[in-house]
């Protein structure tokens, strides 16, 4: 990845060489692909895409071993899962620990990638 020189200079001063090197390594890695299963539609065998690893903080979340072409996946179009970054799933985990009564959540998305969450 070719980062702008002024960005690199500023960020190295801010973070130090070791942490900046870690940042650069992370930016070169292939980003993980995670999905959130729809618990109302994904209970049967074969409903979950194969070769997945659970997301530790979300019962419905899984990491995929590789990024499929979601456009052609009938499971996505049938509503069995939604492509969602695992960090976006963390809020539900926190709320379960802090709030000891039912919580109504509204998860909104807007193209080309904005997300909003409302909890009540």
Where are these regions (language model features)?
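S-adenosylmethionine
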Residues: 1-120
């Amino acid at each position: 990845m070719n980062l702008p020189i002024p960005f690199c200079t500023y960020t190295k001063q801010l973070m130090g060489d070791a942490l900046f090197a870690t940042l650069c390594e992370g930016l070169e890695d292939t980003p993980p692909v995670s999905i959130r299963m729809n618990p109302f539609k994904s209970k049967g065998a074969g409903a979950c895409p194969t070769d997945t690893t659970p997301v530790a903080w979300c019962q419905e979340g899984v990491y995929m071993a590789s990024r499929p072409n979601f456009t052609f996946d009938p499971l996505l179009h049938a509503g069995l899962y939604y492509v969602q970054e695992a960090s976006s799933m963390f809020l539900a985990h926190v709320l379960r620990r802090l709030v000891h009564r039912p919580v109504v959540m509204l998860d909104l998305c807007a193209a080309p990638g904005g997300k909003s969450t409302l909890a009540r």
